[in-house]
């Protein structure tokens, strides 16, 4: 790969459509697949070894890496490309496995304990990146996407109790609650937690298509925090993750309590649940203070001297973490305009009226970053990074092609695609950069540290 020095650390637009042999060799070298291959060899035992485990594993990895739509296309390329065969230990074209060999191998790869070892490889590679790239995981975002899959024709006794593909449905509504779009699919859901700035997945889960996002998000947060080196038992909690952006699917009290306990600021869009109400009186205030809040948690004050009364949003000053409160100030004093009710509200107060809202009243409604602030709007826009990662897994590496039959094969295929994603992220971060058109390539300190970890 040829990457300019001015490109970002993870320059996803510089990925080759067809990786060369040097890139493939570096990718295979970066995979910590020793425990998985040893487990597969023990599983095979003294059975026939016509096609070694390393060769079958190499074909499974090369299929998404080389962007082949089917396994047969990858096998055809191996038969005509001697250099590619040698990278995965196949000496002659007659020794290239058949497609039915790969089908059985994928079923074994997706069963226990190999499925757990496959996921552990992903975790190890994220931990490797997290230990080298210090800002990885500071700003995160999550989302779930539907994946097409085919059901298994028959289930044998003793097989893993994996969820079979089911029908999924997602409805999109407008501001009035009317359904504007319906998306249906048959298969699974892929839940991702992604770094916003680098577009690198930190955690993933595969679930049934009808499982809610808020049910899976706690597992994603714990997995991501573990991969980033957080001490999950430390009190008070210290998390490397500063913010987490998600859509309305994660707007649940349990999720907000978990993020509060993990010291993570939620950037979660709020569901509309109030029926016939537009505002409520803030607890601890009576009608004389003129302070109310709406469903999104925005604090307002009323100028009741004017006719008709005027409602204004109070000026947000900041989050007082030690007090567990959000501080607001009189908008007239803060913004410098005259309010007819100023003399009554701010009598004897040079700074003006201040209101402190205790977050414990409702963690869901009063997050550390209020929804009516520019900071929330900018942070929430980072959620599009998950959509770009989802697009790469589907368009680049065919995770949504629907060519895999059976739950075990599907889980194995998704696990391999996620390894390709995190493996290419490792190559992008460790790749030498070119200084100018005719300049020499050089390694950054991050690339040198990452290569040392891979070689060590």
Predicted regions and their residues:
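Charged, often Cys/His-bearing segments associated with DNA-binding zinc-finger transcription factors
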Residues: 1-39, 339, 429-456
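Short gly/pro/ser/thr-enriched loop/turn and capping motifs at secondary-structure boundaries
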Residues: 273-278
